[in-house]
UniProtKB/Swiss-Prot annotation:
Activates KDO (a required 8-carbon sugar) for incorporation into bacterial lipopolysaccharide in Gram-negative bacteria. NCBIfam families: kdsB, PRK05450.1-3, PRK05450.1-5. Keywords: Cytoplasm, Lipopolysaccharide biosynthesis, Nucleotidyltransferase, Transferase. Gene3D superfamilies: Spore Coat Polysaccharide Biosynthesis Protein SpsA, Chain A. HAMAP family: KdsB (MF_00057). GO terms for molecular function: 3-deoxy-manno-octulosonate cytidylyltransferase activity. Its EC number is 2.7.7.38. This is 3-deoxy-manno-octulosonate cytidylyltransferase. The keyword Nucleotidyltransferase applies.
Amino acid sequence: MSVLAVIPARYGSTRFPGKPLAMIAGQMMIERVWRIAAAVPGVDRVVVATDDQRIMDAVAAAGGEAVMTDPDCRNGTERALDAVKRLNSDADIVINVQGDAPLIPPWVIGGVAETLRADPSLQMATPAIALPPETEARMRADKANGSASGTTVVFNKAMDAMYFSKNVIPFRRKPDEGAPTYQHIGLYGYRRDTLEGLVALEPTPFELTESLEQLRALENGIPIRVVLTDYRGRSAWSVDAPEDAVRVEGIIAAEGELV
């Protein structure tokens, strides 16, 4: 059962143009993500899906593989499928790895791939981590101040997602009691045909309300298996703006390289 990891990397960004090429501790961000994905056991091929020749050239110079995709792709999911088609890939499983996540541990990617490989009945999988109480409290405070950063997920006993939200869910009637809060990690694994079917569907009401692509799957009855993981003491941080790249450099200096 072959696994293809696709890293969508768009050059244009309102807050950080050219973000994939940003240098972080001596390596371009997109190179870092590519190297992490390439280090995952069981991933057979890693490809950067881009819309810009500068990213194509940079990935090739770093020893990676990239494919040019349609500049009109509306999101990373569409770009991932476009890459699969342009590569004429026969991969059974496609892993969509965020190009702005240079601190994603390889074992998190591997856990999603292995979950799909182990159970052929699963259509999609995505990781989540349990939040410590202090992190949850900080997230709730940030949300109260209008932050849209961070997504949480609730799931059933079978570990299938019931809902994803930019709000912190579940609501706590008693602050110190009840189930943990789980933060969603924006990485997805799909069966090839599930990815094709998902992209063909129209955007759905909750997807548009929350601005969360994965809700399109849930609203159309496509189950998403939640894979619980952890960062093993390492920090998580994505890059949305130049100051985030500086923060990531500091984390790497303190914690060392992932690969």
